[in-house]
Amino acid sequence: TLEYEQNPTETNHLNNALGIASNQGPGYGGLSDDQFNDLLWSDFLSSYTYESYQGVYDGSGSLSDGISAVNEGVGIINYTGHSGPTGWGNGAPLSVADVNNLTNTDKLPFIFTVGCNPGQFNDYTECFCESWMWATDNEGNPTGAVGHLGSTISQSWEPPMHGQWAMNSILTESYESNVSRSYGGI
């Protein structure tokens, strides 16, 4: 993470945001998951340093859409939907195997997952959050993500969305008292 923050080899992707979500709800503010991801874009990311946004949602998106977006390069991924220890369940339902085959070398996003158990490391050789952190290309160069925030347990629907909203507000310096200049500061 320190090398990535101090000496990034690729930077064009950092202004791209990706939202992956179900179309289920209601959750935060009575919104469905995809509407909530659109809110994160319109309320925070679009007025910060992010220039483009792609939403990959149930009903209009696919696994290949999500993989293509990640491989092309994104700086942040907000996922809101069902998940488990080995993958996401909605929008672009990536699995551990999909993450281990990504080709986004040196274009590593930070990921906020609102879903059950993606970080359940204690019962799996490689849980979904870990797969993002450990992924490499054929030459051993990092792929996957620079950081992934995800639950280790089954969780309720709406309260974690409040956390995702708050993390995006901190990342985009929307509250003066919560300014962070590094991934570690988030």
Task: Give residue spans per PLM region.
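Cysteine-dependent hydrolase recognition
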Residues: 1-186
